[in-house]
A protein has these predicted regions:
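Surface-exposed, low-hydrophobicity beta-strand/loop segments enriched in small/polar/acidic residues
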Residues: 2-151
Length: 151
């Protein structure tokens, strides 16, 4: 009988580094970054504006989609927000309505059986959100809980 590894051919005992299990697959330390944004009373972000979530992820970090979540208070009708990075503005969360209080799991990268863990950040990776549909409501609170592995 054949032995088939179900992680893209990676083996926990492989002799070459390219085929060894990575920390995000087994035994890695999950880290969390919680970032909160409160829109100002005037001069709120408008359609096309980009929110940059600070701090940046360290080089080589990988976001864990199903543990990363965006929370938001009630906002402007038609307002949407994405969560992405330099690779794609909606890498983690496609445009999502932030019109009523709620939350969204940032797992766009894992949709349709895609990559469970996204590729590593090539540099200090800035996580961004792009505003669409309508501007963000004055005093609206938006919080990003970002889970990542960096080992």
């Amino acid at each position: 009988m054949a032995t088939v590894y179900v992680n893209d051919g990676l083996s926990p005992t492989a002799a070459t580094p390219q085929n060894r299990v990575e920390s995000y697959d087994l035994g890695g330390k999950v880290r969390f970054a919680t970032m909160k944004y409160t829109a100002p009373a005037t001069g709120m972000p408008q359609i096309g504006d980009v929110l940059v979530w600070v701090p940046a992820l360290p080089k080589g970090a990988r976001v864990i989609p199903h543990l990363t979540k965006l929370y938001f208070a009630t906002g402007t009708a038609s307002s949407t927000l994405t969560v992405g990075d330099g690779a794609s503005a909606a890498r983690y969360l496609a445009a999502t309505a932030i019109t009523t209080a709620g939350s969204a799991v940032c797992e766009a990268a894992a949709a349709s059986g895609g990559a469970y863990i996204t590729g590593p950040a090539s540099g200090d990776q800035m996580i961004t959100s792009t505003v669409a549909g309508a501007g963000i409501k004055a005093s609206q609170v938006i919080t990003l809980h970002l889970a990542y592995v960096h080992d």
